[in-house]
Curated annotation (Swiss-Prot):
Record-level GO cellular component terms: mitochondrial matrix; mitochondrion
Magnesium listed as a keyword: no
Listed name of the protein: Glutamate--tRNA ligase, mitochondrial
Family: Belongs to the class-I aminoacyl-tRNA synthetase family. Glutamate--tRNA ligase type 1 subfamily.
Summary of the function given for this chain in its UniProt record: Catalyzes the attachment of glutamate to tRNA(Glu) in a two-step reaction: glutamate is first activated by ATP to form Glu-AMP and then transferred to the acceptor end of tRNA(Glu).
Catalysed reactions, as listed in the record: tRNA(Glu) + L-glutamate + ATP = L-glutamyl-tRNA(Glu) + AMP + diphosphate
Gene: mse1
Domain of life: Eukaryota
Enzyme Commission numbers on file: 6.1.1.17
Length: 526
């Protein structure tokens, strides 16, 4: 049987590593400063659950005057998606979850991308082998004369090899991994769930037995890199999803093997659909980028996910970032699964939109967000490029819309005329076909003579209603249908004023002509 030191030399023969020196086995300069981390894998779109994890880590760091660290866990090269790292950075910045240390900004404990830390992990794997807590395990081909893609392998520990076999396997360059020797797991304390003990006969224990810490390609597994990095980066609190509870027994034993003090663990409850099923990463509406594209504001989404698994104990669910930081506490995290009810998100977003539109500074930011969407959708209209016009639309419709995408839909009639057949059907349900031409003619004549503003338009509508002995509401509905179709909007006088005199005249004349069986061949577009 080989000594542990001989086993460790195998790693040295494959990788250029040196004795652990700078990366001391003891935590350097232990500090009471709270340090949390968000450690996503660049394997695709950021999920709602991941964003919640980032938020809670950010909130706890800021509440405690600590540091929020971003670390990219990119050791799974097969699942890595090109560009996902940039998408993660972009989304976090969109949500103003700015990291204090990490990629781009740097920091004292970098690099912050795990693929750039391979030698560090190999040094620590070497140490575990030397102390007997890890061992090399070869993948040996099952008796065959030719090795190809169909060849089957079985694992054999280097402890069970003779010197001759070790030399043979090394000369043939058989792949091998490094495995960690697990001991009987002990209960651990979680800040959310309290004392957790996993039964010795459970599936989690079986899957944890002597798990791989260094893969055949030289990359560490998630569990190993996670522990090494959390220690070296002085992480004090690990706040992550409930699905990582079974893995914590592996992590704690790794800490113990190195003689390190583990950080405090807080596991967040699962996110579930209203039917109780687990929220899947494959669900499009669970992707953060999809929600942004749908026109939800970042601050509304953050408020929404903050209420999942955490109790603010406030009367209002409306909690902007400053209040979230002030109120957040780990002891208010809940144990039960959190239902993702998007109705709440619509409610919150409507309130955030209304507040943003009412705030002079935020309104300008909102215009910058909305304008490109309008230009793309209504590129044929010069109005889509007019920021002052967009501002007026936002102010007019601030109480009507839940999302920016809904705003895009509602403002359609400010850029294009609605379907004429639909309009005729709508107005005919209000007023007889015989009366309509007379009323439309009166409206056109009246509008031709007035000064174009909301006040004058209101007076004109009252006069028209009196002249035709009709309720004012009926005249207002006639104009709403005739100018806007069946889309909702602001006050009709404000809407008419904002549409503009020429547009109103053009659309009413088109409707009048159609009633006289003189329908234009093409719809009017403004």
């Amino acid at each position: 049987m080989l000594s542990y030191t001989s086993c460790a030399k195998l790693i040295c023969s494959r990788y250029i590593v040196s004795k652990i020196s700078f990366y001391s086995l003891k935590r350097c300069n232990s500090t009471a400063v709270v340090r949390t981390r968000f450690a996503p894998s660049p394997t695709g779109f950021l999920h709602l659950g991941s964003l919640r994890t980032a938020l809670f880590n950010y909130l706890w760091a800021k509440k405690s005057n600590g540091k929020f660290i971003l670390r990219l866990e990119d050791t799974d090269q097969k699942r890595k998606v090109t560009g996902s790292d940039l998408e993660i950075y972009k989304v976090l910045k969109q949500f103003n979850l700015q990291w204090d240390e990490g990629p781009i900004v740097g920091g004292p404990y970098g690099p912050y991308e795990q693929s750039s830390r391979l030698q560090i992990y190999q040094k620590y794997a070497q140490h575990l082998i030397e102390t007997g807590r890890a061992y090399v395990s070869y993948s040996v081909p099952i008796a065959t004369t030719k090795i190809d893609s169909s060849t089957k392998y079985h694992e054999i520990s280097i402890d069970d090899l003779t010197d001759a076999q070790r030399k043979l396997y090394k000369s043939k360059k058989f792949p091998y991994v490094v495995r960690f020797r697990m001991k009987e797991p002990s209960p651990f304390t979680d800040l959310v769930y309290g004392k957790i003990a996993i039964k010795s006969d459970s599936r989690e224990i079986e899957e944890s037995n002597n798990f791989v810490i260094l893969k055949s390609d030289g990359f560490p597994t998630y569990h190993f890199a996670n522990v090494v990095d959390d220690h070296l980066m002085h992480i004090t609190h690990v706040i992550r999803g409930e699905e990582w509870v079974p893995s914590t027994i592996k992590h704690i034993q790794l800490y113990e093997a190195f003689g390190w003090k583990p950080p405090k663990f807080a596991h967040l409850p699962l996110l579930v659909n209203p039917d109780g099923s687990k929220l899947s990463k494959r669900q499009n509406d669970a992707h953060v980028s999809s929600l942004l594209q749908e026109g939800f504001l970042p601050e509304a989404i953050l408020n929404f996910i903050a209420l999942m698994g955490w109790s603010s104990r406030q009367k209002s669910d409306f909690l902007p970032m400053k209040e979230l930081i002030d109120l957040f506490s780990i002891d208010k995290l809940t144990k039960s699964s959190s239902i993702v009810a998007f109705e709440k998100l619509y409610f919150l977003n409507k309130n955030y939109l209304r507040r943003a539109i009412s705030d002079v500074n935020r309104l300008d930011e909102l215009i910058e967000l909305v304008q490109p969407r309008l230009i793309q959708k209504f590129s044929h209209s010069s109005r889509s490029h007019d920021k002052s016009y967009t501002k007026k639309l936002l102010l007019l419709l601030k109480n009507k819309v839940h999302t920016i995408k809904e705003f895009e839909k509602i403002v359609f009639y400010f850029y294009e005329a609605s379907d004429l057949q639909q309009i005729r059907s709508l107005v005919s349900s209000l007023i007889t076909v015989e009366e309509l031409p007379k009323i439309l003619t009166t409206i056109l004549n009246k509008f031709e003579t007035i000064e174009w503003n909301t006040h004058e338009i209101q007076i004109s509508l009252k006069e028209i209603a009196m002249e035709h002995q009709m309720p004012l509401k009926k005249i207002q509905s006639l104009l709403r249908y005739g100018l806007c179709g069946n889309l909702p909007g602001g006050g009709i006088s404000d809407t008419i004023s904002l549409l503009g005199k020429e547009t109103v005249k053009s659309r009413l004349e088109r409707l009048l002509l159609s009633l006289k069986h003189e329908l234009p061949k093409r719809s009017c577009i403004v």
